[in-house]
Amino acid sequence: MRLDKLLVTRGFFSSRERAQDAIVQKTVSVDGTIVDKPSKETAEDAAIEVIDIFNKYVSRGGLKLEKAIVDFGLDFTGKTVLDVGSSTGGFTDCALKHGAAFVTAVDVGTGQLHPSLQGLPQVQSIENRDFRELTPEEVGGRRYDFIVSDVSFISLSYIIPYFAPFIKEDGQCVLLIKPQFEAGASFLNKSGIVTDEKGYKIAIQRVTQEAVIHRLYLNQINISTLFEKVKNVEFISLFSHTDTRYHLDYNVLFKTVKEVKKGLK
């Protein structure tokens, strides 16, 4: 039986989508071996163990930042972090659990930050505030080691121009690039999803070109965590003031996208 189906049959998950999420995240072992293919044929009496990663952070966003930390070899220990578009606080929670000393969480909404993060001495929550209107005085003139951002319904190209007063000269930016908010309406299907590689490329280029204008250079990029096969493809990216002459091979990147999508089928 397919592993994702078996996990539901044996009661590990309520749906195949959730089972697929867990498998792709490499949290399912079969007879002592981690399996990352939902379609893997598995004996019905196999010894299965599951690590519940979905309770690891206050939201799944934390898993996306965690992937950047692992893929890019980032060290948040003792660092200061500005979380732009913090929402529930997945990025904030992940940063703290990876050793960040202080996080300023900024969001245009109100009352979204998870209760477990509210009131923490190492978290400054600024609500009902468009980041583009944030002043250095509101954060005590602090410049941050990291700016992290997962925003929706707005292009990062409108956010990046406002990073300068808040980022240290040797700071880094971890940005989630969402093609559905970058590529333009012509690339969206009826479900509002970008599935075309040309759309992915345009989205990435829109962000990187705006970043260069503000002396922020792409250092690394990879596909972000995919949770369900119906969801948008997103890219986690790393920028800094250091031009590493990073060569983005779109063929390699999009090959990875295809492989991950195939694994979810």
Walk through the language-model features, giving the residues of each.
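Conserved class I S-adenosyl-L-methionine
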Residues: 76-87
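Short beta-strand element of Class I
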Residues: 28, 101-106
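Conserved beta-strand signature within the Rossmann-like core of class I S-adenosyl-L-methionine
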Residues: 170-177, 183
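A basic, amphipathic helix-loop patch mediating RNA/tRNA/ribosome contacts
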Residues: 1-46, 80-81
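A short glycine-rich, Lys/Arg-flanked "PGG" loop and its adjoining helix->strand segment in the class I
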Residues: 157-173
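Flexible, glycine-/basic-rich loop-and-beta segments that form/coincide
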Residues: 233, 240-265
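S-adenosyl-L-methionine
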Residues: 104-156
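Short, glycine-/aromatic-enriched active-site segment of Class I SAM-dependent methyltransferases
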Residues: 179-195
